[in-house]
Design a protein with these regions (language model features):
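Bacterial N-terminal signal peptides
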Residues: 2-9
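Zymogen propeptides/activation segments of proteases
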Residues: 14-187
Length: 187
């Protein structure tokens, strides 16, 4: 909690494509069942600081309603063998200030023994409703949400801003990371 207070007490050195808080995305009018789990945010102070965090050149800072998002994602159940997976629609922020709608379904990537040992980690896959070749992979853990969107223009990343802060996320193009920078999972 002290970390969150200190982060929210400082001003953004955030370099976004859009500096104002966003209205609910217009795309949700077409897909109202997706709900709104992400909102642009502005943090005030001299800088955003999180020990060990490497910031991309451009990014979008978002506030995530993580408890609601987690509940929504966990409402989709893994299919029984031979059955088609349940799917849900999820509005996912993009670095350019927009939202994409993705059809999300649970996916198994961990060995059964690991999945049984860590039931709080869930993984999902999906595709863009508008651009079916665009794929998303995402996971939820007690530490927050991470995602990678594979587009024809490169990868888009979604990461918690700081370890232990699940409701503040960065959305950015992987190409905007400094040369040689490693993702949090690569360290």
């Amino acid at each position: 909690m002290a970390l969150m207070v200190s982060i929210l007490a400082v001003v953004s050195a955030c370099k976004t494509h859009k500096d104002t808080a966003s209205e609910p995305p217009a795309v949700l009018q077409e897909f109202p069942e997706t709900g709104i789990f992400f909102q642009d945010t502005v943090v005030t102070g001299d800088s955003l600081h999180c020990e060990g965090r490497i910031l991309p050149a451009l990014y979008r800072l978002m506030k995530a309603d993580y408890p609601r998002l987690r509940t929504y994602l966990l409402s989709v159940h893994y299919p029984a063998k031979g059955e088609a997976p349940d799917t849900i629609l999820l509005a996912v922020p993009t670095p350019d200030g927009a939202f994409g709608i993705y059809r999300i379904f649970p996916s198994t990537v961990m060995a059964p023994e690991l999945a049984a040992r860590y039931p709080e980690i869930r993984t999902f896959s999906g595709n863009s409703v508008d651009r079916p070749s665009e794929q998303i992979r995402l996971e939820i853990t007690p530490l927050g949400i991470t995602a990678m969107i594979l587009t024809e223009n490169g990868s888009v990343m979604i990461d918690p801003f700081c370890k232990g802060v699940s409701d503040l996320i960065l959305v950015y193009h992987k190409k905007d990371l400094p040369p040689g920078a490693k993702q949090p999972f690569e360290k």
